[in-house]
Amino acid sequence: VALAALDTNAVTDQLISLQSQNIPVVGFDSGVPDAPPGSIVANASTNNFAAAGLAAEKMFEALESQIRSATAANPVRIVVFNQDARGESLLSRGRGFRDTLVDTIIARTPHTAADIRVMGNPAFVASHNPTTGNKVIIEMAVPASSSAQDTTAMAQAVLNRVRGDNIKGIFMSNEGTVVGLLAATDDGAALPATYPGLIAIGFDAGRAQKAAVRNQYFLGSITQDPFQIGFQAVNLANKARLGQSVADVDTGAKFYTHLNMDDDDIKGLIYD
């Protein structure tokens, strides 16, 4: 069985039953978090930490010169939009972007950890993160609720601070936060006009998000690989059926821009 569980609690009895019958279950897409021990033999899903890390690398490349020259008097602030602080996928994406950006700044600029500050929602600020620097600030934002209204309100509040707080980049870790930013910016059209130079990077591939990428309102976005998710899930299930050893598979992610979104290896991944 290949299973994408929106609510693990809703399938607990079925998982226990399948396990008692020695029927292997493979989790795919979001996997099956908190499943009964041993009931899921492997998962085929996106490594969300790594996928968001790719976004951090692209953000750094776009802002490298400004990050290098950042000072306490003229800092660079990058804001990460996370729709909530509970879901494992969003937690992994926020943390992956955060840690990759911190590590990249330290590795590729004169700045040290003492120059960097990670701040914001406590779920996204870890004990190993630098929290006292004043040259590069990574702000982890979460709306009051995951509703579209509150997500848009969060986006608008951050946009109101772009100039005053030297906000240079925004990463949106899912389609919901992308929609919030687009709602606050006339589907992105206000970004180049009102916030010139602000780098926006999204995640996933809804119709409005793809239009924002195509129109170059966004630098680009991260897409998962639904083909590989399905293919690897079936492959793992078949191996498990045959009694072969199986392990979790990272199905990968890609960064798409206005330049490559019509390429054969990308366009099939970003359907509406």
What are these regions (language model features)?
Residues 1-272:
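A residue-level marker of the well-folded mature domains of exported/periplasmic proteins
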